[in-house]
Regions:
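Subset of outer-membrane beta-barrel
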Residues: 21-331
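Sec/Tat signal peptide C-region and signal peptidase I cleavage site
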Residues: 15-20
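Sec-dependent N-terminal signal peptides
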Residues: 4-14
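Positively charged n-region of N-terminal signal peptides that target proteins for export
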Residues: 1-4, 151
Length: 331
């Protein structure tokens, strides 16, 4: 079993080494890079080693097997992104037969970009003519699986269908009688996520790795592009593990660090902290390095009787701050 674990770790290391470092800003479908879960965002997205259950389908599918409920868990997320772009997502996990056959999951995400007015170059006084309105839409639907290889090592993967419809436009066409033709710009592709979580056995020290949005090249019309492929390594630890168990009670102070290597941007680091009091109320703060528009984030959470509510706020420099809401239910 140790050999299998080492092979998986080596595969992740090789992927990180051969990753095309010089190709920055060569990706599309950037909606896949926007954080969905309030708890993750409130911790600066330093989340791949602490995500569990339904939240894990959006960050590290290996964490699904760490779900706290016995059978079923669902997470509903909503956020108003910049420029009035609306994100909604649902994560679900199901653990039949007391996890003897692993944990199964599903993720659904959809994005509403609002209504836009189309125009076309035209030899008129204004130099253009309106072509009507259009409403871009984006969708991601995935199925996932996670399993314990040992009591300390977990693996998981997700296959997802992602699509982006940016509407219909009129383009030049030499064959057409009018010299113009209408075209729907729609692109879709199958993408994959892979992840691991390793509990060291040294108190609560956890390591994790994951790859998100691995796919073939796609294109709308002529030029091809890649999805926002991202490789992440992370570590987390509960600082209250250093305190006597009688003094700490049902409290925790999680600290997490993720090193992120995206295809489209230079590398950066996510830092996050979560203080949980009495196993019910959580306060969070996070920081993302090497960002132009935003860096800090804050949040809180409440959980009781299988219900959980999370909220986070991310301030932006030149835009209104982004608020995220998450409702979680488990049985």
């Amino acid at each position: 079993m140790l050999k299998k674990i080492m092979v998986i770790i080596v595969i992740f290391a090789v992927v990180a080494v051969v990753y095309p470092y010089k190709k920055l800003a060569q990706t599309g479908f950037q909606f896949l890079s926007v954080s969905q879960v309030s708890r993750a965002s409130g911790m600066g997205e330093a989340f791949i080693t602490i995500c569990d259950g339904a939240d894990a389908v959006f960050y590290n599918p290996a964490g699904m097997v760490l779900m706290r409920s016995r059978l079923f868990e669902v997470s509903v997320n909503n956020l108003q992104w910049i420029a009035d772009i609306k994100y909604s997502s649902i994560g679900m996990v199901f653990s039949p037969f007391e996890r003897r056959y692993g944990v199964f999951g599903m993720s659904i995400m959809w994005v509403d970009y609002g209504v836009f007015y189309g125009t076309m170059v035209y030899p008129s006084l204004d130099g253009y003519v309106e072509t009507g309105t259009f409403s871009p839409r984006a969708t991601s639907i995935g199925v996932a699986y996670s399993k314990n290889l040992t009591d300390r090592f977990m693996v998981g993967g997700q296959i997802k269908y992602v699509a982006l419809n940016i509407g219909r436009t009129v383009i030049p066409d030499a064959i057409s009688e009018t010299g113009l033709t209408a075209k729907d710009f729609v692109a879709s592709v199958t993408a994959f996520d892979f992840g691991t979580v390793f509990r060291t056995g040294i108190k609560s020290l956890v390591f994790g790795m994951n790859i998100r949005n691995f796919s073939k090249e796609i294109k709308f019309y002529r030029e091809g592009f890649q999805l926002p492929l991202t490789f992440t390594m992370g570590v987390s630890f509960d600082l209250l593990d250093l305190v006597d168990s009688e003094k700490r009670g049902n409290n925790s102070l999680l600290v997490a660090v993720d090193a992120v290597h995206p295809r489209a941007y230079p590398e950066y680091v996510n830092l996050g902290m979560e203080l949980k009091l009495f196993g019910t109320f959580s306060i969070r703060a996070g920081y993302k390095s090497n960002q132009d528009e935003y860096g800090t984030a804050y949040g809180f959470g409440l959980e009781k009787f299988g219900l959980k509510f999370d909220y986070s706020y991310t301030p932006f420099k030149n835009f209104d701050g982004v608020q995220r809401l998450t409702l979680k239910f488990s049985i």
